[in-house]
Amino acid sequence: MAHGLVTFSDVAIDFSQEEWACLDSRQRDLYWDVMLENYSNLVSLDLESPYGTKSLPTEKGIYEINLSKWNSNGKSKSLGLDWMCEGEFEGPQGPRESCFNQMIINYEKTPTCRENTSVRPHQRLHTRENSYECKECGKAFSRGYQLTQHQKIHTGEKPYECKECKKAFRWGNQLTQHQKIHTGEKPYECKDCGKAFRWGSSLVIHKRIHTGEKPYECKDCEKAFRRGDELTQHQRFHTGEKDYECKDCGKTFSRVYKLIQHKRIHSGEKPYECKDCGKAFICGSSLVQHKRIHTGEKPYECQECGKAFTRVNYLTQHQKIHTGEKPHECKECGKAFRWGSSLVKHERIHTGEKPYKCTECGKAFNCGYHLTQHERIHTGETPYKCKECGKAFIYGSSLVKHERIHTGEKPYECKECGKAFSHGHQLTQHQKIHTGEKSFECKECGKACNHVNHLREHQRVHTAEKPFEQKEGAEASIQHSFLPQHKENP
């Protein structure tokens, strides 16, 4: 690393006075520990010091910062705090400048950091010393506070509770971040698109969308990511590592939040409830997506055709229509699919697996979506409502088809004659006129028809059924009045 490229201000952590007040003594000790380590690292690498200590000669080459107490008269740029101290830097020529509180930084300007006791935390970067081991799982850490934080995963301890909603957290900084949800505070705004964020780290990650920067690269396949946690998760595909196991069913997960969500399947807990319709969900993201049914919001738009979607994964799936990409192939029959989930569902045709069972009637389905739709028959839920006439439907696809009555849209056009239809199955039936296909055959005489309704009419010849038979009186005239309609609309 070149001399002077990194200063202490580049690695300092920002805290406002209010945020600092939220930290307990252990967290403040942790803060000073980290700041000391960062400063020692810079010194040991002979990088620029914000305190100018390198220009102060001493007999031994050792410099000491003597410290005093804090006040709130200004801001320390080097620490990023809204406080500064009244103490002074004591060099061989007397007081020099303002300094840290309750910290003494000693370092010796020598060629190697290993000869200096003040840079032991830095040495662990080279030696990878992990002297603090968890007795529960064997995981080791280089710092004691890291082990303390980790152990809360096993004990379930969550000492930091939100006064607004009573939600509890393992660490204080998680609570601080969570509280911004209640206040609605989003102080970090993107200059490129105006989008605002609760946390500065979210803004930093977001900016990479505009710059295209992907600083985290996988050494195995060279795939790059915007975020470090995305890389960590990706690397588990190569290693097969799954750290978090469900004690109820043994299923393992690569991320702890996925395990937490999964456990709610066993417990039945659905903490995220829609205020509009009362429907509850296992995870918050599902609630956010559900709310778009009520608001009509479709934030994800296809740049090719302008079609918009409520979920980003729907857009990703849709875009494969334009590219024609079908990377997922069935080993049994060779059929290819755009999406892996479609392949999984398709494979159940071969295996006969139907893992999704209705608790009301026992009917089983090969995919969860079909079960969800089926359950609405029992509950009577019709979440998809037409804005024109107010008619409601069980399925979103039914609403889409219904809306074509109002719009007059007929998106399915016959390439042979140009006739258009509002539904795909109508076009399929119509095309049989051109192809001569007659797929519906009478078992009595072998006559084939191109439409199931035509077959039903024909079968009455064999059964001698006469649904529109002439009768005397008013009843006969009423029944006979339907006969012309039947002939016009076979």
From Swiss-Prot:
One of its GO terms (molecular function) is zinc ion binding. It is found in: Nucleus. It holds the Pfam family KRAB. The keyword ATP-binding does not apply. Its main location: nucleus. A zinc finger (C2H2-type) spans 132-154, 160-182, 188-210, 216-238, 244-266, 272-294, 300-322, 328-350, 356-378, 384-406, 412-434, 440-462. Residues 470-490 are annotated as: Disordered. InterPro entries: KRAB (IPR001909), KRAB_dom_sf (IPR036051), Znf_C2H2_sf (IPR036236), Znf_C2H2_type (IPR013087). GO terms for cellular component: nucleus. Residues 6-78 form the KRAB domain. GO terms for biological process: regulation of transcription by RNA polymerase II. Keywords: DNA-binding, Isopeptide bond, Metal-binding, Nucleus, Repeat, Transcription, Transcription regulation, Ubl conjugation, Zinc, Zinc-finger. There is a cross-link at residues 109, 401 (Glycyl lysine isopeptide (Lys-Gly) (interchain with G-Cter in SUMO2)). May be involved in transcriptional regulation. May play a role in spermatogenesis. Belongs to the krueppel C2H2-type zinc-finger protein family. This is Zinc finger protein 331. It comes from Canis lupus familiaris (Dog).
